[in-house]
Regions:
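Right-hand nucleic-acid polymerase module
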Residues: 1-140, 150-284
Length: 284
């Protein structure tokens, strides 16, 4: 007979360095899954956004580290796309150029995560230029954030955000570079993961509340590995741990070889306490 009420541990291994853990009550109470009132749809949207962002961080931490790169690519007036579809075509043409160059120079396959940020009107084919709207807030001018594996120089990656067919024999000549027809401003930096991995960059990408974001990845990224255990924790133990929410030693003992970097307790009137953990592998 299936257990009616229990505490589930879900481990999410993000590569060799990162581990996320959800410890959540699972109950058969119908009230636990209900949302009431006017704000229920907005609450669900907020939850969906939170889960999408978290999934992005998990995939990024699984596949990228400080040897890899972040590219910000924008559009100038001469090359401003009129639709989201056109912008997506532009950025995928760019990624194809990078893919070919990377294979030729390093022998590696390109790995990437792409975020395109835009205003909702662009989905309908009506571009909203950067400027003041009726709300008095700035519209989001369409642009891209790309995380890619290392191997090519930052200068060459920036050079390829252009309509010019690059002559690589002249590519190091400053005069040649000045004559390149850039699509817009482009900047490439090395990733700088902190104690929470790449989450800081994701927060930067998501800093604007206004506007929409569409993200996609290359097909060759590794997926986080998930393991579930319904017998490791009890409701009583979870209540005990919640009394000392800042105590990291509990989790060091529970997950040996890992250092907790984030601990987040949540309380629900129907199901009780749950906890989310992010841990980093202790380096020798």
């Amino acid at each position: 007979m299936a257990r009616k009420n229990f505490v589930r541990e879900k481990r999410i291994y993000c590569g060799k360095e990162w581990l996320e853990v959800d410890i959540v009550p699972v109950t058969n109470m119908p009230e636990a899954g209900k949302t009431k009132g006017k704000g229920s749809s907005q609450k669900q949207q907020n939850l969906n956004d939170k889960n999408s962002k978290r999934r992005f961080v998990q995939i990024a931490n699984t596949n990228f580290n400080e040897e890899d790169l972040h590219i910000s690519a924008t559009y100038n007036e001469a090359h401003l796309p009129m639709t989201l579809e056109e912008a997506e075509k532009n950025v995928h043409n760019y990624l194809n150029r990078v893919k070919r160059r990377m294979k030729r120079v390093t022998g590696q396959d390109l790995k990437y995560m792409l975020v395109t940020e835009y205003t909702p009107e662009e989905e309908e084919g009506q571009l909203t230029l950067e400027g003041l709207e009726d709300t008095g807030t700035k519209a989001v001018r369409i642009h891209h954030h790309i995380i890619i594996n290392g191997g090519l120089s930052r200068e060459d990656l920036e050079l390829m955000w252009s309509t010019t067919r690059i002559n690589w024999k002249k590519a190091q000549d400053p005069k040649y570079r000045r004559e390149v027809d850039f699509i817009g401003f482009v900047n490439c930096d090395r990733l700088q993961p902190n104690e929470n991995g790449i989450e800081g960059l994701v927060n930067y990408i998501n800093k604007r509340k206004k506007g929409c974001k569409k993200w996609s990845t290359s097909q060759n990224l590794k997926k986080p590995k998930i393991k579930k255990n319904d017998h490791k924790y009890s409701f009583r133990k979870l209540r005990e741990y919640a009394q000392t929410p800042e105590d990291k030693e509990i989790w060091r003992k529970r997950y040996k070889g890992y250092e907790p970097t984030k601990i987040d307790y949540q309380y629900n009137d129907y199901t009780g306490w749950s906890v989310y953990l992010r841990l980093r592998k202790v380096r020798d």
